[in-house]
Amino acid sequence: MHIIHISKFMALLAISTIAIPTRGRSEVDSRDVNQAQTVTSGSSIAPSGSEKRPAWKAEFAEQIAEAQRDKKPFQCPHCKDGISNRVALYTHVKAFHGDKPVYSLKNYHDERRFDS
């Protein structure tokens, strides 16, 4: 019993040591940031939101969206969201749509297409 309490205390101590910044560690972190800022000649580290999307991303946006839809073979019949598997579909419908029926609209139409 005491071993469990001691191990919990040691884990808590280890987490708190990592989470609380010390004087030495904060100086190292700030120095790294200052060096990164001087390398970029005073420009901000994070890119600004006003930058335009690269041309190649705009060109292939539809193909990227189609590939993402293909990775999710199930579709919620209520909100048309793409879902990756049956368990996720069941969980999604129960969580967001309550007592509505659980079935996949995309698979229903695919099966009917192959039956004809």
UniProtKB/Swiss-Prot annotation:
- The signal peptide annotation in the UniProt record is 1-24
The C2H2-type zinc finger ranges are: 74-96
Q: Where is this region: Disordered?
A: 24-53
Q: Which GO terms describe its cellular component?
A: extracellular region; host cell nucleus
Q: Which InterPro entries match?
A: Znf_C2H2_sf, Znf_C2H2_type
Please name the SUPFAM superfamilies in this protein's record: beta-beta-alpha zinc fingers
Q: Which domain of life is it from?
A: Eukaryota
Entry's localization field: Secreted; Host nucleus
Any one GO molecular function term = zinc ion binding
Q: What induces it?
A: Expressed during multiple stages of host plant infection, including the prepenetration, early biotrophy, late biotrophy, transition and necrotrophy.
- Key words of the record: Host nucleus, Metal-binding, Secreted, Signal, Transcription, Transcription regulation, Virulence, Zinc, Zinc-finger
Q: Where in the sequence does UniProt note compositional bias of the Polar residues kind?
A: 33-47
- Physiological role: Probable secreted effector that translocates into the nuclei of host cells to reprogram the expression of targeted genes by binding on effector binding elements in rice.
Q: What is this protein called?
A: Host transcription reprogramming factor 4
- Organism, per UniProt? Pyricularia oryzae (strain 70-15 / ATCC MYA-4617 / FGSC 8958) (Rice blast fungus)
